[in-house]
Amino acid sequence: MDPDAQTRAAIEEHWRASERGDTEAEHAVYADDAILDYPQSGERFRGRDAISAQRGGHPASRHFTVLRITGTGSLWVSECVITYDGVPTYSVSIMEFAYGHVVHESQYFADPFGAPSWRAALAEPMPGRSIASA
């Protein structure tokens, strides 16, 4: 298997493990000294153990739907919908790899929002979706 296929497979398993609640398998993709940044809150988590502990301690029921994984070499991006207690949040995860493991990840979160009326004539619904009202 070529290196990009191996990395994609590792990311896919990361998200499958996240969905099934297997925190050990979910975090196997991270280097021991990996860094996870949440730029919107200003938080940084150092090391696989800290990353795993903060995710494992989340109080909400979570479900993960992967929309897209793209990348090559050391830089990969996942777009997901993470549903917390039934409420969807869109997430973009930017992962930097070295020696087969994530060494740095930045994860961004965005709640759905209503589309403003001024651009209604310019937009069409995304596949499988309807346009939310403001």
Report residues per predicted region:
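A beta-strand edge to alpha-helix "cap/lid" segment located at domain peripheries
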Residues: 1-3, 52-134
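Aromatic side chains
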Residues: 14, 30, 38, 45, ...
